[in-house]
Amino acid sequence: MRVTARLAYGLGALVDLAAAGRPVKGDVLAGRHGVSTGFLENILADLRRAGFVASKRGGHGGYWLARPAGDITVADVIRTLDGAAVVERTSRWDGLDTVWESISQATMDAAQAITLDTVAGGSDVRLTT
């Protein structure tokens, strides 16, 4: 699976918001992740439309989680920002499509078991098969 910049920064911002527990300005989040404010705010807008983030403009404004961190999974974020976890195919070997599809599905199943609350709490995420 190739982790896109949108996914990495979006998930990072959500984890920061979960840990903060209060509104955080977009420029503060962007500075923390070393990315432009405009780029991160575009990602946050997608997360807002999906119902994960709320925002308010002004001196006492910022972004915050619109739902409890325990109700948002990494799979939710992947689907919102990237559509789905798809293993990037580097070759065109015949007969491997089902292998790549199985790996992609296993990735999404694992991501469904991880919540923002778990990640923001600093828990060591270990998956078992």
Listing of model-derived features with the role each one plays in the protein:
Residues 90-129:
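C-terminal regulatory/oligomerization modules of transcriptional regulators
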Residues 49-52, 80:
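Residue cluster at the C-terminal edge of the helix-turn-helix DNA-binding motif
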Residues 3-36, 64:
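N-terminal helix-turn-helix DNA-binding core of bacterial DNA-binding proteins
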Residues 69-94:
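Conserved segment of winged-helix/HTH DNA-binding domains
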Residues 15, 45-46:
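Core alpha-helical elements of the protein kinase catalytic domain
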Residues 31, 48-49:
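Alpha-helical residues within the helix-turn-helix
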Residues 51-66:
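Beta-hairpin "wing" of winged helix-turn-helix
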